[in-house]
From Swiss-Prot:
GTP binds at residues 48-55, 113-117, 165-168. This is Ribosome-releasing factor 2, mitochondrial. Mitochondrial GTPase that mediates the disassembly of ribosomes from messenger RNA at the termination of mitochondrial protein biosynthesis. Not involved in the GTP-dependent ribosomal translocation step during translation elongation. Required for respiratory growth and essential for mitochondrial genome maintenance. It comes from Saccharomyces cerevisiae (strain ATCC 204508 / S288c). GO terms for biological process: mitochondrial genome maintenance; mitochondrial translation; regulation of mitochondrial membrane potential; ribosome disassembly. GO terms for cellular component: cytosol; mitochondrion. It is found in: Mitochondrion. Keywords: GTP-binding, Mitochondrion, Nucleotide-binding, Protein biosynthesis, Transit peptide.
Length: 819
């Protein structure tokens, strides 16, 4: 009976007494994750709203895995994953950090801790591109918050585990948070929560209050408590009384949920368990939970208090027990849908049935003060060897690799190879100028210089679909203090946007003004800090401003260039529309612009030019980006949602050695096409935000009047907060589901009684309302103080980017006047 618990934390020292089992010195000796078989690898991301406890939970994971000898603390600024000075001084995660560590001596976990602040959404987007599954951390006091809803939608296809954190805090409610989870994410779907463990409260001898001290393990029917004086000590007890009753009800509910989807468990329940819920083996339950989690039919739910070191080891167990390995996860999305892909249990993802084809994605670039530029990559198929010749199928460049590393947040471990499913780092002078975020790398798995043996037309043209970059919504002007500082400013800006592609630079050719654009005020504040303090740029900044764009509402004339030496190009610009037949589309940066190339007859024949098609394509893309940044005729803002169409009759001289002339020709054609377009064919666009407001019912009238009048908002819905969050029921019965999910009620404490009484009073006199609206960003930049005044400090709001929309005629002159 006790063996299972002893094995749960490998390498632990065990003391057994008559009534309890103590597991001491939890953790495991460090093992190189490079040696773990694919089936034992887990690529996970930690996602949540800001301040839910992502970094605190990650630091406990690293401590219990044996990576760190002390527990890092966000408040004291000594965390491993938040290693940037700005992160430690502000106590928030700014950029995603990757780290690899072992668990239970046999599993390797590659973890990416992502930011929770909405301004750093791109860090979450690119992390989701390379992970196989997620751990969603929820605040037990706040429940499901706005950014949690956003990252849940972004990670829709990824298997998930939910960890309800901060169960030790005043006002924490497991019941409320699980109900919130169901009502906001699972209503209208077939997905259900499965409570893997539930909170355990111990009554204090000097009061009537109950204190959160551990969890009840529903699968194994044990109580786990943590010693507050010793972070390494876990006490495992048998259940009795209320704990046993709650566990039995949760186990019955768990089995009822699992058997709706799992026929194997149904058979085990009826035959081997003889219809007795208590006789269903933990082994069968774990297997069923794993199977259904990977199919996104269920979401395992656990709880704890990471700051108090409670519940982290069971969470790590759930990660390796329930989440998929790289050979069980989603296949990567390739540009060529005809290329066969499948999973091989030995080598992982097999592309084009070629075991020697190695494909990797560069998803992040950082600049280390000692090592220089470092590129984070995810290996999807094959094996990457140090010293290999690699082909960048995005740029058409070929180069030799230097060192390979496995990341450990601020540090890294050198390795000779990276295998399918791993996340690693590339360093060295050869990669610095040859790889950018979103590039696909291809090489031969066993030969150092084996590119010639790969299929040139098929395998060397493969690309993993690019990482989506949301458009910036704020900008700040930047200029060097003196003319001599201009070059260093440009170099620093280039480093900045290479590391973070959600930042962009635009330049007004008429005024010479340079503008740094970003996702929000905090995003730009961090970027400015990094420019001045880390990259030592001697610059001055202007005022924060909304990032307006321009677009065209009709197609331009077709402009043509033809020369005697063999160059010919014809192009036009048109508003974005549905995909054009017999054309290929390539994204152009962050402004929803595209290059559309009609298929050229030369593509299906033997390539006759000295330079690769990728080199020609990248020159055209570069000229398109420059041409569109020049701006429109309303206020010279960069162009948005435009397509540049290259006609199929283009040609270049067969003996062309560099694509430099192509860049010049196409750029001039773009300038001419835009210059010939009449001013009335341009529209001004502004960022529109989704606004979520929570306010007392008594303030709805005044808030709505302000929104629709002064702020030009479009109201989408108004509903009771209780209709999207059911707090207090012991069961949740979703209309779409046939069974009732048992959720234990929260322990009755003086605090909860007071809170419940207050909530009852509020419900009877001042119901909370949730208003959803769309509003121009310009009209809401100073909304915090206004809402505080309108709601007497009782209102809360969150905003996130929705889209770019045409500025209405009644507001156009006002906006232009303020520029």
């Amino acid at each position: 009976m006790w063996k299972w618990n002893v094995r749960r934390w490998a390498g632990a020292r065990v003391n057994i007494s008559k009534n309890r089992l103590s597991v001491i010195n939890v953790g495991s000796r460090y093992l190189s994750t490079a040696r773990s078989p694919l089936s034992k690898v887990r690529n996970i991301g930690i996602i949540a709203h800001i301040d839910a406890g992502k970094t605190t939970t990650t630091e406990r994971m690293l401590y219990y895995a044996g990576i760190s000898k002390h527990i890092g603390d966000v408040d004291t600024g000594d965390t491993i994953t938040d290693f940037l000075e700005q992160e430690r001084s502000r106590g928030i995660t700014i950029q995603s950090a990757a780290i690899s560590f072992p668990w239970r001596n046999t599993f390797a976990i590659n973890l990416i801790d992502t930011p929770g602040h909405i301004d750093f959404t791109f860090e979450v987007i690119r992390a989701l591109k390379v992970i196989d599954s997620c751990v969603v951390i929820l605040d037990a006091v706040a429940g499901v918050e706005a950014q949690t809803e956003k990252v849940w939608k972004q990670s829709k296809s990824k298997p998930k585990i939910c960890f309800i954190n901060k169960m030790d805090r005043m006002g924490a409610s497991f019941n409320h948070t699980v109900n919130d989870l169901i009502n906001k994410f699972m209503r209208g779907t077939t997905t259900k929560p499965v409570l893997v463990n539930i909170p355990y409260y111990r009554k204090q001898p000097t009061s009537n209050d109950y204190v959160f001290q551990g969890v009840i393990d529903v699968v194994n029917g044990k109580r786990l408590t943590w010693n507050p004086e010793n972070p390494d000590e876990i006490i495992v007890d048998e259940l009795d009384g209320t704990s046993l009753e709650q566990c039995n009800r949760c186990r019955e509910s768990m089995i009822e949920t699992l058997t709706e989807y799992d026929e194997d468990l149904v058979q085990h329940f009826l035959e081997e368990a003889e219809g007795d819920y208590s006789k269903v083996s933990a082994q069968f339950l774990n297997a069923s939970i794993r199977k259904l989690t990977m199919k996104n039919m269920i979401v395992p739910v656990l709880c704890g208090a990471s700051f108090k070191n409670i519940g982290v080891q069971p969470l790590l167990d759930a990660i390796v027990n329930y989440l998929p390995s790289p050979i069980e996860a989603e296949l990567p999305e390739l540009n060529d849908k005809t290329v066969p892909m499948k999973y091989d249990p030995k080598v992982g993802c097999l592309v084009n049935n070629n075991k020697n084809l190695c494909i990797a994605l560069a998803f992040k670039v950082i600049t280390d003060p000692i090592r220089g530029k470092q590129i984070f990559i995810r290996i999807y198929s094959g094996t990457l060897n140090s010293g290999n010749t690699v082909y960048n199928s995005t740029t058409g460049e070929k180069f030799k690799l230097g060192k390979l590393l496995i990341p450990h947040a601020g540090t890294s471990q050198p390795v000779n190879i990276l295998t399918a499913g791993q996340i690693g780092l590339l360093t060295g002078s050869t990669v610095e100028n040859n790889i950018s975020t979103g590039d696909t790398l291809i090489t031969h798995s066993s030969k150092k210089d084996g590119l010639k043996s790969l299929d040139k037309k098929k395998e060397l043209t493969l690309k993993i679909n690019s990482i989506f970059i949301p458009p910036p919504v704020f900008g700040v002007s930047i200029e060097p203090r003196t003319l001599s500082n201009k070059k260093s400013m440009e170099e620093a800006l280039n480093t900045l946007i290479t590391e973070d592609p959600s930042l962009s630079i635009s330049q007004n050719d008429e005024t010479g003004q340079t503008v740094l654009n970003g996702m929000g005020e905090l995003h730009l504040e961090i970027a400015k800090d990094r420019l001045v303090n880390d990259l030592k740029a001697d610059v001055e900044f202007g005022q924060l401003m909304v990032s307006y764009k321009e677009t065209i509402n009709s197609e331009t004339n077709i402009e043509t260039y033809e020369s005697d030496d063999g160059y010919r190009f014809s192009l036009s610009l048109l508003p974005n529309s549905d995909a054009l037949p017999n054309c290929l589309a390539y994204p152009l940066g962050v402004n929803e612009n595209f290059l559309i190339m009609e298929k050229n007859g030369n593509w299906d024949k033997e390539w006759k030019y000295q330079v690769s098609f990728e080199s020609i394509l990248n020159s055209i893309i570069a000229s398109c980006i420059v041409g569109l940044q020049r701006g429109g005729k309303i206020a010279n803002f960069p162009l948005y949602a435009c397509s540049i169409k290259i006609n199929s009759d283009w040609s270049v001289p067969p003996d062309i050695e560099t694509p430099q002339e192509i860049l010049k020709i196409t750029r001039n054609l773009i300038f001419k096409a835009l210059n010939d377009l009449k001013p009335e064919k341009y529209n001004l666009l502004e960022p529109i935000m989704n606004l979520d407001l929570t306010i007392p019912q008594s303030d709805v009238g005044t808030v709505l009047q302000d929104l629709t009048g002064a702020r030009k908002a479009q109201i989408l819905s108004i509903e009771d907060e209780s209709s999207v969050s059911n707090s207090g029921a012991s069961t949740c019965n979703s209309p779409e589901n046939s069974n009732r999910i048992y959720i234990p009620s929260d322990a009755v404490t003086t605090l909860h009684a007071t809170k419940d009484k207050k909530n009852t009073q509020e419900t009877s006199s001042n119901v909370k309302k949730i208003i959803k609206a769309k509003v121009p960003l310009r009209e809401i930049t100073t909304y915090t103080n206004k809402l505080r005044s309108l709601s007497q400090g009782r209102g809360e709001f969150n905003i996130e980017y929705s889209d770019m929309e045409k500025v209405t005629n009644d507001r156009l002159q006002s906006i232009l006047h303020d520029l």
